[in-house]
Amino acid sequence: LILAFTPTNTVWGHNAALLGSKIYYTGGTIPNATIWKDVKDFSNTPNQYATQSEEFYYLDVSVPFKTNETINSWVDLSSVSIIPPHSWSAFSLCGPESSTLVMFGGDFGKKTPANLVFTYNTTTLEWHNPVTRGQPLNIITHSVCDFKTGKMYMFSVTLDTANASMNIFDTKSLTWGVGSLIGAPSGRFDYTATLLPNGNIVYIGGVDSHGPIPLYNINDNTWSSMTTTGYLPTPRGYPSSVLTKDGRVIVYGGYIDRSKLSPVTDDLVVLDTEGSVFTWSKANVSTLSPASRCYHSAILVDHYMIVAFGRNDLYLPSLTMNEVYILDTSDKFDYKWIDEFKPVKSS
């Protein structure tokens, strides 16, 4: 383990997952800063413009930190990782005894491994690359985990086709299955997936998304859709989303035009899922906001949404800058971007 570590802050398309008081990060795309400013078409980034990351580290959220100062609570775990450089993978806390991180698929460049599942035991600090049964084609996707069953759900298109699939991975038996596609939306990527307590996965945004919000029920393997009321958010690709205890899905960032990655102007919108009909609203933010971004990560710790890295296409940050931002979500009528994280003490 390496303390006093600073991760590459220009990364995007990385993964993040919370376990206890640690936010784990892995992978992503790192631009070549000397020539990136000359790239005009962002929809397909050639290898000479960017490389894939093999960093693996965590942010310790058991201690306070400030975003306008050097963050000293990063811990580097790259020395124990066996994963090749990668980006755009599915990554969840979803394993035996709730102590295992599971990663599947993504973009490995020209070095795609035969077995696409990697697991990290946070107790023994060991990575494994197990052989699984019924492995699907490689996909770029988001995942959600049902902690009661230990199953990961990944709805996506394959890397080389437009065919939709609902892939279900049982982390206990290391077995793959498929979910129903009856009533499913078209295959998509660059969306967010949020599992509600009632068993519905809410899919928001993404390329080829339009109309009502798709819902997949993990309890009975069925698709439905929800027509929403309230504010009409700008359609967007690759935002982030977090779920609060009172049923708010907070959606941040995203792009409008994939070829240019133009940022959305309403970069913080909220979907209230508590009623029989979901309601959108544009968040009221009473503080200055960071530059809108996409391809970032967002993790909810207590009532703080911690946003890390990503792209805004206005500039590449200096390597000395923190690219971590904190949104206080405690007041649903008044959201605040703040510069200090203070762990909430349990009573």
PLM features per residue range, with description:
Residues 1-347:
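Kelch-like beta-propeller repeat domains
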